[in-house]
Structure formats: structure tokens, C-alpha cells
């Protein structure tokens, strides 16, 4: 009888979760065949939720671990997993999607757009959201930038009456641009955070080796996707934001200060979680200036990432030999491809564990990881945020992983070319 190690079972569950993400549309269609409210319909809709996938398979793995050993072993394993990043994403997503923060962002973008000739306003609004916001992710963190960009683009692009070509091409470019746009600094992009301390990468290093290249690619990607959808975007009317003019400055400033404190100490869950509880109290006493917090959406995204971290920690046994055996170009292509099926932060973290990795190999590993960050929902930690916020604009309230993958190929290739040749 063949026996599997714990690592191998974790990889089987990981592979099952990856396949499951590509089948969510199938589960959604199957659910529609059953009476509404029935057990089968609810169960299939549950399986069709992208944010649930990795948490569900992680639960299956923990169940197996409890069965072959005992429940204490599963608890000990969970205690060894670092859930700081999922917790941070939950907190920053809930904060960044509040009414005062969004009102400030909407006011800046729409105000800048209104200065342009009327015929160019939609283009300026779109390009500002697709270029400036991803690059701001280098300073406010990628998850916060993803929330802002997704909510800015939602009323312009992600409505059900827009074409599938527009929605998927813009979503793909948004994911790629957020992934590479966070590389101007060493403290914003998850795959960079994982290696910056171990390899001594500071702000100057990131700007000189990644930042300027990625900024160019972000602009090129945004302009190309605009030109591809020029006629449809031009016909879209600018969103009308009701609350931005009436938001007091002190209210916006208080939210920005809370976010700044969380971002500054994003590596300390013991700090930012109590601070978030303080923030919840603040939003309650200032409820007249608030809209309902997106706690459900934020928790689902955190659950997805928590499952990814739980299973991803045990993938070292097969990823590390691949990383250590490849030449630079092979490693670059391999890292880009591997990012599609594993979180890019987990991939770069495993790179820090490979002894004797050359400086060139370090660069191409991270370059490939960020370039491939838009290929799938699991490729980059902020991606589930966009899916969670924008999926209502897609048929069946579900984003097709295959359509997203196909739409992301060209912007990913452009990112690879920029990081390899520039």
C-alpha cells in the first residue's frame, strides 16, 4: 500500500485547490439546475465561491492531518503558520474601502479628469486608475491600491452591460499592473517583502533595478488596453460619486492616519489588529459619514489567503529543487509560470532558503514572480480582493479563471520583456 508524506498530501490538496479554481464556473452553472434554496444548490454555490477554494482544501488537509496523527498535530501546525499577511490584507481592505477613503480617491481622480476636455475625460479617468493607482501601491501597499483601483473602475468598466472583452482585458491588466507596480519600494509588494531583508534589498536597489522598468510597463499596459477598448470606454459615462463633496476633511484625515499606522506596522499583527478594533469603534461613532464596512468581502479574501498560506508552506519540497537547478533565463520563465499555480510571495520566500543563489538568480526569481502576478487569482495576494469586489459584474457572479489567464498573457509577456531587456 502506497503511503504519502504530509508534504505530498499537502501538495495533492494544493493541486486540487488550483484545479478547483478553474472549475468554479462549472459549479455555478450546475447550481442553477437545482431548486433555489435546496441543499444541492447551496452546496454548489458554495463550491463556486473562488474565495472559499483554498480555505476549503486547507480544511481537508487539516482533517487528514488530524486523522493520521491527532487533532493536536493539526493545531500545532496551524500555530507554526504565519497568518500576518492574510490578517493585514483583511484590515487594509476593510479600511481602504470605507466611504471617506474612497471619496478622497474618487474626488482626486474625477477632479483631475474634469479639468480635461469632455471627450477625453473617460480616457483620463481610466488611465489614472490604471497607471497612478498601481504605482501608488508601492507606498500604500498593493492590497490598498487594489481596493482603490477596483472600486474606481467598477462603475466605469465592470457593469453587466459591458462586453466580456472589456471586462476581462481590463481586469487582467489591473492584476498585472498592481503586481509590478508595487516594486518601486521594498515594503509594499508581498514577493519583495519576503526577500528584502534576507537579501539586503533597500529602496534605492528597488528603484534602480525594478521600479523604473515596471513604471514603464504599467503605462504601456494601460495605454494598450485602453486602445483595445477605445470605442467602448469612450462611450462609458464617468461615474457620479455622491459623497465626495460633503466629506469633512478631518474625517478623511483620520482614516488616512489609521491606514498609515497599519501600513507602517504591517508586519506586526499584535499592533494592527487592536488598532483595527479601535478603528471599528471610530467608524461606529462617526456613522453619519460612513457606509457599511466591507467586512464580509474582506474576510472572504483573508480566508482565501489563509488557506493559501496553510497549504503553501508545505510546497518547499518540490519548488526548492526547481529554483536551485535552473539557469537565469530558465528560472525567469519558470518563476513566471510557477506563479500561476502558487502565490508569488511563497515562491520568493522559498528562494531565500536556497543556499548560494547568485545575484542574477535572485533578480530573475523576483522579476518572474511579479511579472506573473496577474495570471491567476492565486498568483498575487491582492488578486482575490479584485475578484471579490468585481465579480458581481461578471456572468454568474463569477470570474472565469481560464478567460482571465488568456487575457493576462499579453500584459504578462510585456512585463517579462520589460524586466528582462530594460
Task: For the regions a language model picked out, list residue spans one by one.
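Transmembrane helical segments that form the transport core of multi-pass membrane transport proteins
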Residues: 68-71, 75-76, 102, 255-359
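Interfacial loop-to-helix junctions that mark the boundaries of transmembrane helices
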Residues: 1-9, 42-50, 71-86, 203-213, ...
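Hydrophobic mid-bilayer segments of alpha-helices in multi-pass membrane transport proteins
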Residues: 9-29, 49-67, 82-94, 148, ...
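Long, contiguous bundles of hydrophobic transmembrane helices that form the permeation core
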Residues: 220-264, 271-276
Amino acid at each position: 500500500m502506497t503511503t504519502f508524506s504530509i508534504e505530498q498530501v499537502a501538495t495533492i490538496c494544493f493541486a486540487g485547490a488550483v484545479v478547483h479554481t478553474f472549475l468554479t464556473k462549472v459549479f455555478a452553472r450546475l447550481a442553477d439546475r437545482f431548486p433555489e434554496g435546496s441543499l444541492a444548490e447551496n452546496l454548489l454555490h458554495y463550491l463556486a465561491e473562488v474565495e472559499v477554494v483554498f480555505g476549503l482544501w486547507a480544511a481537508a488537509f487539516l482533517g487528514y492531518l488530524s486523522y493520521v496523527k491527532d487533532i493536536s498535530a493539526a493545531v500545532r501546525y496551524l500555530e507554526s503558520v504565519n497568518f500576518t499577511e492574510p490578517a493585514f490584507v483583511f484590515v487594509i481592505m476593510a479600511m481602504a474601502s470605507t466611504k471617506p477613503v474612497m471619496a478622497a480617491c474618487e474626488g482626486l481622480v474625477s477632479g483631475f479628469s474634469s479639468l480635461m476636455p469632455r471627450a477625453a475625460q473617460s480616457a483620463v479617468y481610466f488611465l489614472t486608475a490604471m497607471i497612478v493607482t498601481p504605482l501608488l501601491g508601492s507606498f500604500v501597499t498593493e492590497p490598498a491600491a487594489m481596493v482603490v483601483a477596483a472600486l474606481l473602475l467598477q462603475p466605469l468598466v465592470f457593469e453587466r452591460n459591458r462586453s466580456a472583452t472589456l471586462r476581462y482585458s481590463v481586469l487582467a491588466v489591473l492584476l498585472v499592473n498592481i503586481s509590478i507596480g508595487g516594486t518601486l519600494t521594498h515594503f509594499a509588494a508581498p514577493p519583495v517583502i519576503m526577500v528584502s531583508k534576507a537579501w539586503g534589498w533597500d529602496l534605492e536597489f528597488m528603484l534602480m533595478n525594478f521600479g523604473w522598468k515596471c513604471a514603464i510597463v504599467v503605462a504601456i499596459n494601460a495605454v494598450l488596453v485602453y486602445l483595445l477598448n477605445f470605442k467602448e470606454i469612450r462611450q462609458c459615462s464617468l461615474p457620479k460619486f455622491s459623497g465626495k463633496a460633503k466629506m469633512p476633511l478631518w474625517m478623511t484625515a483620520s482614516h488616512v492616519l489609521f491606514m498609515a499606522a497599519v501600513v507602517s506596522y504591517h508586519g506586526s499583527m499584535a499592533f494592527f489588529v487592536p488598532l483595527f478594533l479601535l478603528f471599528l469603534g471610530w467608524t461606529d461613532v462617526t456613522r453619519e459619514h460612513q457606509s457599511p464596512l466591507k467586512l464580509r468581502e474582506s474576510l472572504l479574501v483573508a480566508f482565501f489567503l489563509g488557506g493559501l498560506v496553510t497549504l503553501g508552506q508545505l510546497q518547499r519540497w518540490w519548488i526548492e529543487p526547481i529554483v536551485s537547478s535552473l539557469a537565469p533565463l530558465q528560472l525567469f520563465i519558470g518563476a513566471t509560470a510557477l506563479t500561476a499555480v502558487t502565490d508569488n510571495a511563497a515562491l520568493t520566500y522559498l528562494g531565500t532558503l536556497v543556499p548560494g543563489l547568485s545575484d542574477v538568480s535572485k533578480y530573475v526569481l523576483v522579476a518572474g514572480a511579479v511579472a506573473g502576478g496577474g495570471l491567476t487569482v492565486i498568483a498575487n495576494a491582492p488578486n482575490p480582493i479584485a475578484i471579490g469586489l468585481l465579480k458581481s459584474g461578471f456572468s454568474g457572479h463569477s470570474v472565469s479563471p481560464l478567460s482571465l489567464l488568456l487575457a493576462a498573457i499579453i500584459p504578462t509577456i510585456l512585463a517579462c520583456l520589460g524586466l528582462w531587456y530594460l
